[in-house]
Amino acid sequence: MKLLKKSSSLKKGVTKRAKLQKKPPSKDEASSSDEELAKLDGEGSLDGNESEEDDGTVQVEKGGMKKHKLDLEALKKSDPEFFKFLQQEDADLLNMEEDEDDDEEGEDNEDEEDEEEEEESDEDDDEEDDDKTKIKKIRKPKVKSDSSGRLIVDSNVYSYLQQVLVLDDETTTPINPSDVRMAIDVFVACVARVGADIEAPKYVINEQSIFEAVVRMCFQAMPDVLKRLLKARPDGEKVLFSKTMIKKYQTYVRTYLHAMIVFLNEVQTTEVIIATLKAITRLVDLYAHFSRMSKLLIKAIVKIWSRKTLECRLPAFVCMNLLVKNYPQHFVPLYKTAYVAFVANSKVVTNETWPLLQFMHRTFAEITMINPEQAYKYAFVYIRQTAVHLRNAMIAKGRKDLIFSIYNWQMMQCMYMWVRVIAKAHSVNGAEQIGELVYPLIQVIVGIFKLCNAPTFLPLRLHCCQMLIQLQASCTNYIPIMQLSCDCLEELARELKSKPKPAKGAVKLPDIECTLKCSTQYSDLPQWRKTISEHVFRTMMQSAHLLASQAAFPDVALPINHRIATILDTMKNADQAHLFRGFQTKLKEHSRFVLDVLARKHVDLNDEMQVRAVRFDLNNPDSPIKSFYRQWEKVWKMKEKSALENSKKDDKKKKKEEEAAKKRKATETLEDDDDEDAKPTIPKAKRKRIKIGAAAKRADATVPDQFADMSLANWSDED
């Protein structure tokens, strides 16, 4: 009964406490309510060891748990029915032990969870610290300014830019646009230091080491930085950029791209030009997005491709090829600019410039094959333009200016280049249209050959024969080169009729490959006649070697033999006559060889297999013409090697002489300076004044003034 009273009092206390909590107490009632709550807590405790929380749950302290258990056991023994009633109605009074155990376990679990959360929070703090160290903002250095107000780039600025821009992890590291802008402004200062005519930049660089370090850093880091800033993504060989980012940062990008082009135009050192071109090649995808920048880039790289050394021209061609290959819209302006630049820079041909011109021939042919459909339109127009010049010169033969508009290196180099382009087109699929231009090109070259028959232009006619040989070898078209070479032989025979005039002393002859016209001072020399006859013989051998495997060789060689025989009858020089007679005998032997092969086999022209079998038999390496050609080819190679060695020796001698002359001048200037310094200063002696008499003062009117021509009116620097 006592327990029932206690439980009922507990319930009454809980309800009363809830009511007191719902009503907000006033200031007067606050102290009384606290006392009542304290009394309620005291009334509901079991022997001072039990308390009740705000939610009505009972908490029993550990000290009164044993006594509570003993009371429950005594109640169970004394009144089992009431104990069952308590189990059904108020089981919380009986389950105090289990609740306490659960509370203890819960406290233990909460302690463990708190420990785990503390450990995890510590780990998270460590990770955050690591991230902060990774994405740690670097303080911008304080930049000093000079007297004009421009900011000075020193080692602190360079180290800051290097830490910000040169980053290993590209994905996680963000890029600050202000840092990119600062780097671009610093590079513009480098461009101004080179000597470019631009506005005064924001920054200025005074140290050469800082200048070189900044340029190197921009070349290495800026392409990747701009790609990350513009959110670039690869698309095959091209790189695509975000349109929104390009619109947002186009002023930055255009400034840097223009600065790179200005820097490329200003520098002159080969190593710096190559490094700049490599950096620009990494930015080609970015240049292609801006039409004005792409035009400036085309002008700059074509200028290097046509004017600089071979080491510089190669990376320029790589940049040109990449721009045209990935972005066809820039093909036409680049193609036009390259052709005009080639024509403008082919006026002078020497042994040093020939490799550069040949490089331009090959690279222009490669660019043509990238887009042959568009290139055909302009190739047709350019070849037609040369034909128009030739027609004007043929109509007015008496005008030397029109003849020399054809007989110059620009026209001949254009012919060489189109020969290379058409020869390349016959080996590339899809370039059939350009391959068809071989017919008008042959007509133009033959017209140039027949324009003027003067013996002084014999080297030019040999150049025309060499171009026709290249076309016939690559295009498999028959060209009457042997007849044209016989025309050269006739001119040579006319020149050999006159007696040679030996030179006085050692004379250096011009290289036939680098000359179009032979002057009269060389034409009468025996050394020149020997070299020109060897070149004529070589062209005749090459033209015969091209036809050696053709069944029509006897028919072509028959009139050639008669012409050579008549020409040799008039030739007085025994050495040259012996050279061409050997060629004539080989023509006869090879024509017999071809007739014997054709006589042994029955050939049906409609059967391709039989025709191929005959060509295979005629293409015998032991045939008379081919074996004879191999022997002479070895001789020609040996002569070319010796000529190259001699030219190298001459160049070395010239360099040594120039260096010695410079040293002499330097020593002479030093000696003159020393002599001037060593001259003693002699004090001038005071002159005694001589008294002039009255008779001496009177001037003689009969004596003329000897210094009249040195008056102020007639005196000038030119005199």
Curated annotation (Swiss-Prot):
Similarity-based family: Belongs to the NOC2 family.
Q: Where is the composition biased (Basic residues)?
A: 1-24
Which species expresses this protein natively? Caenorhabditis briggsae
**Which Pfam family is one of this chain's hits?**
Noc2
- Name used for this protein in its record: Nucleolar complex protein 2 homolog
Return one GO MF term: transcription corepressor activity
- What InterPro entries does this protein map onto? ARM-type_fold, Noc2
Q: Which gene encodes it?
A: pro-2
Biased region (Basic and acidic residues) positions are: 25-42, 643-661
Q: What does UniProt give as GO cellular component?
A: Noc1p-Noc2p complex; Noc2p-Noc3p complex; nucleolus; nucleoplasm
**Swiss-Prot/TrEMBL keywords:** Developmental protein, Differentiation, Gonadal differentiation, Nucleus
One GO process term, biological-process aspect: ribosomal large subunit biogenesis
Coiled-coil annotated spans? none
What is the documented function of this protein? Required for normal somatic gonad development and for regulation of germline development and proliferation.
